[in-house]
Curated annotation (Swiss-Prot):
Xref: Pfam families: Hemagglutinin (PF00509)
Cross-referenced InterPro entries: Capsid_hemagglutn, Hemagglutn_HA1_a/b_dom_sf, Hemagglutn_influenz_A, Hemagglutn_influenz_A/B
SUPFAM superfamilies: Viral protein domain
Protein name: Hemagglutinin
GO CC aspect terms: host cell plasma membrane; membrane; viral envelope; virion membrane
Location in the cell: Virion membrane; Host apical cell membrane
Taxonomic path: Viruses, Riboviria, Orthornavirae, Negarnaviricota, Polyploviricotina
Signal peptide positions on this chain: 1-16
GO molecular function: host cell surface receptor binding
Amino acid sequence: MKKILLFTVIFLYAKADEICIGYLSNNSTDKVDTIIESNVTVTSSVELVETEHTGSFCSINGKQPISLGDCSFAGWILGNPMCDDLIGKTSWSYIVENQS
């Protein structure tokens, strides 16, 4: 009897670390692709991208952000000559990319 009880407890603990993903049903027709699934119906959303800005950026832990200005992130990484003034930047808290 003790062996059965021990086996049951071990089995339940082994299954306890699984993550179950559920979906709340509503009348939404919006579909998105997630990391693990395609065409998942959107049930609720929160806008995380800021649409307005005051023009000033905060430093984090004493490090200033790097503003790419008219340069794109890809252009900075690939060495676009328009991004030459960013070459000497070796440390920053986050990257600010302006919309073009």
